């Protein structure tokens, strides 16, 4: 049985980790860390856990936690994991970090986009970027840190990766339009996220400055063998609880048919349990992935402008956060990737 500790257990992603791990036959949650709710019953914070979780929230003492668990999930704001981790902790346990602290390989890029001084740059090189469908061969029993990808980045990269890797699109022409439910902004109280502020409205935010941009550029840059890739990424907030829909546009680099594009997607995803490439002319919808670890992908060739339109949808709290983290844990401990994640999407 894998003993699990969660730091940041009372955030939305943390609660989703709890929900998923309760159904995992090989995992046991032994530590629910939360600075905001120390000594409070977890089920008082999240009533959906009443009679399911009989434990109190504890502090985020990573050094103590490392002595008690096999893996620590850090579902915390940027900067916290890097400020806590050290050699002694990593000699005792493994860390799956849901923040951005170890996703970017260039510490200067991290500090530029996140406006934070990185507290543990010595661990950046060894951290594995945990996009399982692309990087699973880099995860082994010796891996100490997994950088769980962001929600927008997971959707964007999985939607675009085969097209970039196979040279079907010109990567310099990529434009990504992304829309997310409000849970992506976290559980903290902010005026911008109040009901009256978001209901009956949509807005773009982080235009030209969103912090997931360099993460997408870095990973797609690896796909095309470049370190200078630049693209346009614009996220939008939509009035729903959860879900992300990405629509990406790029110029075609060569003449292709529907069958050519479909074959390229199938080359990478045909055997992937969690990636569903949809039938022709079927567009992804967030409602068909809600509550699940699935990613739905569709595409359309636009011959009038010689562009390819690529679409992807996932649940930002599951495949975009907690579900992918559990998938990474399964990889880390040699379990089937879909253990604890064989959950049908919720509808309605």
Swiss-Prot record:
Major enzyme class: oxidoreductase
GO biological process: L-arginine biosynthetic process
Catalytic activity: N-acetyl-L-glutamate 5-semialdehyde + phosphate + NADP(+) = N-acetyl-L-glutamyl 5-phosphate + NADPH + H(+)
Listed Pfam families: Semialdhyde_dh (PF01118), Semialdhyde_dhC_1 (PF22698)
Pathway named in the protein's UniProt entry: Amino-acid biosynthesis; L-arginine biosynthesis; N(2)-acetyl-L-ornithine from L-glutamate: step 3/4
Signal peptide: none
Active site: residue positions: 151
GO molecular function terms attached to this record: N-acetyl-gamma-glutamyl-phosphate reductase activity; NAD binding; NADP+ binding
Recorded superkingdom: Bacteria
Primary localization class, coarse: cytoplasm
Localization in the cell: Cytoplasm
A GO CC term attached to the entry: cytoplasm
SMART domains recorded: Semialdhyde_dh
Keyword Nucleus: no
Record keywords: Amino-acid biosynthesis, Arginine biosynthesis, Cytoplasm, NADP, Oxidoreductase
NCBIfam families from the UniProt entry: argC
Family: Belongs to the NAGSA dehydrogenase family. Type 1 subfamily.
Function: Catalyzes the NADPH-dependent reduction of N-acetyl-5-glutamyl phosphate to yield N-acetyl-L-glutamate 5-semialdehyde.
PANTHER family, per the entry: N-ACETYL-GAMMA-GLUTAMYL-PHOSPHATE REDUCTASE, CHLOROPLASTIC-RELATED, N-ACETYL-GAMMA-GLUTAMYL-PHOSPHATE REDUCTASE, CHLOROPLASTIC-RELATED-RELATED
Protein name: N-acetyl-gamma-glutamyl-phosphate reductase
Annotated source species: Lachnospira eligens (strain ATCC 27750 / DSM 3376 / VPI C15-48 / C15-B4) (Eubacterium eligens)
